[in-house]
Regions:
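FAD-binding core/adjacent interface of flavoenzyme oxidoreductases
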Residues: 3, 70-162, 168-175, 242
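Internal hydrophobic alpha-helix adjacent to the cofactor/substrate pocket in enzyme cavities
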Residues: 169, 298-324
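C-terminal auxiliary extensions adjacent to catalytic cores
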Residues: 336-377
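Glycine-rich, N-terminal phosphate-binding loop of Rossmann-like dinucleotide-binding domains
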Residues: 9, 92, 105-106, 149, ...
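FAD-site-proximal beta/loop scaffold in flavoenzymes
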Residues: 117-141, 235-303, 307
Length: 377
């Protein structure tokens, strides 16, 4: 019997496991998913936790309940991948053999890479950090809020811009918007990562008095004086700092010598096989793919990988290809949203701003558990 091992119980790994369990007969393959915690977390909800619009408990479910019964769930942390021997070693000493391996471990937050980050900055890229940010926002009575990113790449590129819009909406509802200066700092030449959508976001910022500075790449934080310094030589003071932390690829990828300088796993952008080892697939945030690091990308990639593994195990040509498709929603506040859909060949069409796409995001947040991990959509 063939053995498929999947590392990571996020959206991508869960979909791959469930699709394989659906497509392959029990005698064809044993499907094992390895996850460190056994808890599946809906990360797009973190920003809503920070702004008191989401119950944290509703963002977490048991991974076992999301998997088909025949998928074997192993609780443990992968610490080494021996690609030549086709083995994965876990922290407790167990070793798992595989015929096909799927790496879906996401990105790793590394705030210690930027001195001063832990003392000075807040963020919403983990549940704990979102709850701390919520407390900081509740206590904030006025001053300058700076929103920026420590470095690129990072998960969910639109998230910082979205957070700036949420800050405006949040402080307006509290009746203290006139006492708050929101300043958005972008490392790019524009405020929004997707160029076709940037003019719309600039208009939103202008309408709601959100200041912006481009070409601001963070060099250091002076936590004592509350000043942020850029590589370009600018300095910006703050009273509250919200900063996306530095990211790296999965630690096991780095420790196994499989990653690039950032720890990202070099992956073919169409087949999603790793470039050095065709029997290892990778998807989502842990890869070096030229697409957004987002759950929506992993969602579409998972289906390609599942089809390819089924073909491999049955001795058939693997013809499935990933076209770079990503779809995401951005909440602009005031019950207005932006929907963006794009792929390698088709950039996003500048969308209208309206209620429909805001409702689309709200619907997805609520329907995620029913529709996405199972691979139904």
């Amino acid at each position: 019997m063939k053995r498929v091992v999947i590392l990571g119980g996020g959206v991508g790994g869960t979909i791959v496991a469930n699709l394989l369990a659906k497509k392959l007969r029990p005698e064809e393959a044993e499907i094992t998913l390895v996850d460190k915690t056994g808890k599946h977390v809906y990360q797009p909800g973190f920003v809503y936790v920070a702004f008191e619009r989401q119950n944290p408990k509703k963002l977490v479910r048991d991974e076992r309940k999301l998997l088909r019964k025949r998928v074997k769930l192993v609780l443990g942390e992968a610490v080494r991948i021996d690609a030549e021997a086709r083995k994965v070693y876990l922290a407790d000493g167990r070793a798992l053999d595989y015929d096909r391996l799927v790496v879906a471990l996401g990105a790793r937050l590394t705030p210690d890479e930027l001195p001063g980050f832990q003392e000075a900055a807040h963020h919403f890229y983990s549940m704990e950090a979102s709850l701390r940010l919520r407390e900081a926002l509740e206590a904030f009575r006025g001053g300058r809020v700076v929103v920026t990113v420590a470095s690129v790449p990072y998960k969910c590129p639109p998230a910082p811009s979205e957070a700036a819009c949420q800050l405006d909406y949040y402080f307006t509802k509290r009746g203290i918007r006139d006492k708050v200066d929101i300043h958005f700092l972008s490392p790019l030449s524009r405020v929004f990562p997707l160029e076709p959508v940037n003019p719309l976001v600039e208009k939103i910022f202008a309408k709601h008095n959100i200041r912006s500075t481009v070409f601001f790449n963070v060099e250091s934080i002076d936590a004592e004086r509350k000043i942020l310094n850029s590589i370009e030589g600018e300095s910006v003071p703050y009273d509250l700092l919200i900063m996306v932390p530095p990211h790296r690829g999965a630690k096991v990828v780095e420790d196994s010598g499989l990653g690039d300088r950032g720890g990202w796993l070099p992956t073919d952008k169409f087949t999603l096989r790793t470039k050095a080892h065709p029997d290892i697939f990778a998807l989502g945030d842990c890869t070096d793919l030229p697409v957004s690091k987002a759950g929506a990308a992993a969602h579409f990639q998972a289906k390609v990988i599942a089809e390819s593994i089924v073909a491999d195990l049955r001795g058939q040509p693997a013809t499935a290809r990933y076209d770079g498709h990503v779809m995401c929603y951005c909440d602009a506040g005031y019950h207005k949203g932006i929907a963006m859909s794009f792929d390698y060949e088709h950039p996003p069409v500048p969308p209208p701003l309206g209620l429909k796409d805001w409702l689309g995001k709200r619907f997805l947040n609520r329907a995620y558990w029913l529709l996405v991990p199972s691979g139904r959509v």
